[in-house]
Amino acid sequence: MNKNLLIKIENISSGYGSTVIVNNFSFEVEQGQILTITGSNGMGKTTLMKTIMGLIDAREGKITFKDEDITNSSPDYRSKSGIGYVPQGREIFSTLTVEQNIMLPIYTRKKLSFSPEDKLEEIYSLFPILKEKRFADGSSLSGGQQQQLA
């Protein structure tokens, strides 16, 4: 095996419930290498990171870290081995709907210089995915969608 290989992800698949979010994804990172994973909101970047961390079980595939198969190891073990990531920052109420999360700070203001409904439509025009998911709980959104909501 390559002595410089830090992490190897082989054909990983994971998701939530019956929904597969990450499907047959593979990559390798060598010591000192920087890897950027990009994609649109809801494409599985956060799910992939949570799978590598062991916060979500891999349905298929293998995760190797420093020549050790860690696919079935606990999140605690992975953390102690040196695997970690900084999650996306977001402050939302996970039990409120998207629309309730948007409207809450508007309705808590004493004086408004605008129509709450107009402000809501303005926000939806900037973030169409939020309008599409306006009745969904905040916790059901992807990490990127939660960040937009915040």
Where are each of the predicted segments found?
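Conserved ABC transporter NBD signature motif
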Residues: 61-69, 81, 114-120
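Short coil-to-helix segment of the ABC ATPase nucleotide-binding domain corresponding to the Q-loop/switch region
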Residues: 95-103, 134
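The feature captures the beta-strand-to-loop junction immediately N-terminal to the Walker
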Residues: 38-40
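Short beta-strand immediately N-terminal to the Walker A/P-loop
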Residues: 35-36, 85
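Helix-to-loop junction immediately C-terminal to a conserved catalytic motif
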Residues: 53
